[in-house]
């Protein structure tokens, strides 16, 4: 089986299930494949290049409805994480913390159909800004957000870890607000597959579900943080220093 993921900590359960042997314990031969961006995840699922994948939680609904792509029925198996995102700003804005003053700012978001887009729009609108006309919202793959912040191409981003912590680690940005302070308990990423895959392979899907759920239960316990950071840090997975992942 081929499972896609974006190299962010939201994908922790489905990534860690690979090195920790949770897939093989269910009798599955799984390849987890790092993917550059969310549009590519969508396209590879529609084209059946992936059997299952890491999704942004709004994506299965958007794909099923044909928003931004041909309509293809998709299902959410599990929500992989809640909260865990942040608005990170360039260091030059450290004294400009009031969003009312952010007219003209350029922000990166990972995808149109994302909680990141919805939460950033909500936050800006609460401050009296029109997200469509007063600021620029640009779709940028999460792995490119810190580089764009450093280059001055954007003023900030609402994105996933490890890239908020990476911006702090590299001293190019600071965390302005955590998304749990905008909506505590909000869903973020999901694990899912096509309706067709579930119907054709119900036992395989059930085994996949059990493997990811087992990993999620382990990831929920803070005492496992260091071990999990160690197994997801390598280049094949998140390609991040363990220090960034444990912060």
Regions found by a protein language model. Give the residues of each.
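Second-shell loop/turn segments in exported
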Residues: 106-110, 196-198, 216-220
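A polyampholytic, Gly/Pro-enriched intrinsically disordered region
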Residues: 155-160, 197-203, 207
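Secondary-structure end/capping motifs
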Residues: 200-247
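Short, glycine-/small- and polar/acidic-enriched structural segments
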Residues: 1-139, 145-186
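Short, hydrophobic/aromatic alpha-helical segments in well-folded domains
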Residues: 144, 162-163, 193, 214-215
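Short glycine- and hydrophobic/aromatic-rich loop-to-beta-strand nucleating segment
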Residues: 86-88, 190-193, 197-198
